[in-house]
């Protein structure tokens, strides 16, 4: 039987025949990512009109904001979104079969004197998306953007004092779209690492200070904020967990949710249990039911335990990862609940992808998600049909898990670059000259020609 191939997805094939692109970079982005995107929508049983709508929106409103097409031979902006510095990632909520994607907007000024740390490109992307979704509200976005990202003067100062930045995360903001019922919900993710450098404040001080200022207008978020901060402080100065970023829904303040993300360097079941229960502060029946499923996932996935940290440099495209990364968790500050709601992340990047897929399939079967269990591995293979699947270890970046209203929610975050027939289509041999973005790198990739280490699908 012929193996499934994402490039055979009908919506991708039809639109590829119809589309014209403004430049070669946008064409390459489409053929690199759209096969997987189209296949994911198709397998998740989106209606045909919705498949076309979401793919057209992606082509018209998002691809122009992805910058030059990444290669190892040309400088580019390196995004924190993936270990390869690529600015786009698809994910799937397996519980509800909801497709999502995240991207870091990049434009022609990114990395130049006009915007050395990519502070402003996000506004251009928002202008493209605002007319398409009436529910978008930027009030909370403006608040966090002002408090947690660089202004023009701060950007100029750091650009002239680059030694202060060093290996600090340079990504400051990302956008994400949840695709449902022909519409999309827009979210933002804000990284205040550069703001911490220029202000001399810690990320903890910046994030919690900003949310507290917002609580003056929205006091209902104060109780869960206080509980979360008390938990973090109770772990002491030698804690292996620390705030990393904040996110919120770009909808009306009455409906929006704030999430504070913690990086947990200690990879262990005990550390994950501590995050899940907020050090024992959450002990209700629903929390304990969810905890049993966290333990089940831990046993199935088999993360490598120990103290982990993010390696400083990004991985050059094509290099097989040989690393294990820290855990992550976020805590939602609901306006009608004094207790923060946890979501934990199993960092599976660098693990054998077929073993991860087998673990997930078992979990799906136990939950009664029979269709997801039946199709998950086959669909995963279709995204990279020409790869040696038994050797892949870069597809699953994260697996997230939360539990609310006695219902489990699990999502997978997947490598979304050079998918489908890319490896055999010779598109990667095109001579790419970045036309729309300066794409200045945080560092230039090393010469890979001497390593001899590549994997099918990335070049």
UniProtKB/Swiss-Prot annotation:
Its EC number is 2.5.1.34. Signal peptide: none annotated. GO terms for molecular function: prenyltransferase activity; tryptophan dimethylallyltransferase activity. It catalyses: L-tryptophan + dimethylallyl diphosphate = 4-(3-methylbut-2-enyl)-L-tryptophan + diphosphate. Keywords: Alkaloid metabolism, Prenyltransferase, Transferase. Pfam families: Trp_DMAT. L-tryptophan binds at residues 80-81, 89, 191, 244. One of its GO terms (biological process) is fumigaclavine C biosynthetic process. Dimethylallyl diphosphate binds at residues 100, 187, 189, 257, 259, 261, 343, 345, 409, 413. Disruption phenotype: Impairs the production of ergot alkaloids including festuclavine, fumigaclavine A, fumigaclavine B and fumigaclavine C. InterPro entries: Aro_prenylTrfase, Aro_prenylTrfase_DMATS, DMATS-type_fun, Trp_dimethylallylTrfase. Ergot alkaloids are known for their toxic effects on humans who consume contaminated grains or livestock that graze on grasses harboring ergot alkaloid-producing fungi. Due to their strong affinity for monoamine neurotransmitter receptors they may also have clinical uses such as treatment of migraines, Parkinson's disease and cerebrovascular insufficiency. Homodimer. Belongs to the tryptophan dimethylallyltransferase family. Tryptophan dimethylallyltransferase; part of the gene cluster that mediates the biosynthesis of fumiclavanine C, a fungal ergot alkaloid. DmaW catalyzes the first step of ergot alkaloid biosynthesis by condensing dimethylallyl diphosphate (DMAP) and tryptophan to form 4-dimethylallyl-L-tryptophan. The second step is catalyzed by the methyltransferase easF that methylates 4-dimethylallyl-L-tryptophan in the presence of S-adenosyl-L-methionine, resulting in the formation of 4-dimethylallyl-L-abrine. This is Tryptophan dimethylallyltransferase. It comes from Aspergillus fumigatus (strain ATCC MYA-4609 / CBS 101355 / FGSC A1100 / Af293). The gene is dmaW.
């Amino acid at each position: 039987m012929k193996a499934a191939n994402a490039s055979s997805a009908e919506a991708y094939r039809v639109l590829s025949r119809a589309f014209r692109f403004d430049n070669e970079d946008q064409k390459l982005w489409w053929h690199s990512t759209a096969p997987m995107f189209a296949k994911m929508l198709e397998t998740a049983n989106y209606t045909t009109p919705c498949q076309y709508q979401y793919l057209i929106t992606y082509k018209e409103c998002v691809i122009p904001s992805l910058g030059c097409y990444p290669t190892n031979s040309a400088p580019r902006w390196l995004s924190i979104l993936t270990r390869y510095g690529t600015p786009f990632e698809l994910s799937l909520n397996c519980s509800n079969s909801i497709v999502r994607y995240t991207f870091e907007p990049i434009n022609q000024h990114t990395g130049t004197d006009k915007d050395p740390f990519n502070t402003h490109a996000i506004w251009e992307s928002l202008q493209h998306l605002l007319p398409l979704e009436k529910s978008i509200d930027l009030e909370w976005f403006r608040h966090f953007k002002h408090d947690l990202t660089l202004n023009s003067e701060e950007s100029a100062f750091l650009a002239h004092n680059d030694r202060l930045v060093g290996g600090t995360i340079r990504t400051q903001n990302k956008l994400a779209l949840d695709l449902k019922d022909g519409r999309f919900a827009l979210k933002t993710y804000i990284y205040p690492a550069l703001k911490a450098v220029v202000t001399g404040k810690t990320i903890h001080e910046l994030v919690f200070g900003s949310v507290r200022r917002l609580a003056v207008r929205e006091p209902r978020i104060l109780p869960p904020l206080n509980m979360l901060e008390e938990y973090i402080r109770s772990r002491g100065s030698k804690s292996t967990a620390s705030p990393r970023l904040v996110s919120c829904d770009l909808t009306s303040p009455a409906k929006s949710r704030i999430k504070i993300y913690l990086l947990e360097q200690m990879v262990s079941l005990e550390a994950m249990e501590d995050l899940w229960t907020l050090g024992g502060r959450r002990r209700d029946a629903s929390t304990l039911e969810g905890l049993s499923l966290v333990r089940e996932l831990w046993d199935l996935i088999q993360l490598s335990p120990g103290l982990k940290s993010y390696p400083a440099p990004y991985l050059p495209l094509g290099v097989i990862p040989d690393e294990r990364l820290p855990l992550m968790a976020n805590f939602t500050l609901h306006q009608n609940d004094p207790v923060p709601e946890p979501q934990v992340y199993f960092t599976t990047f660098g693990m054998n992808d077929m073993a991860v897929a087998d673990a997930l399939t078992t979990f799906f079967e136990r939950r009664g998600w029979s269709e997801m269990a039946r199709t998950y591995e086959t669909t995963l293979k279709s995204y990279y049909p020409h790869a040696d699947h038994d050797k892949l270890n870069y597809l699953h970046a994260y697996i997230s898990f939360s539990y609310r209203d006695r219902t489990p929610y699990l999502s997978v975050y997947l490598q979304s670059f050079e998918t489908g027939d890319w490896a055999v289509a010779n598109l990667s041999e095109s001579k790419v000259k970045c036309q729309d973005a300066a794409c200045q790198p945080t560092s230039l990739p090393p010469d890979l020609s001497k390593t001899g280490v590549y994997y099918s699908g990335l070049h």
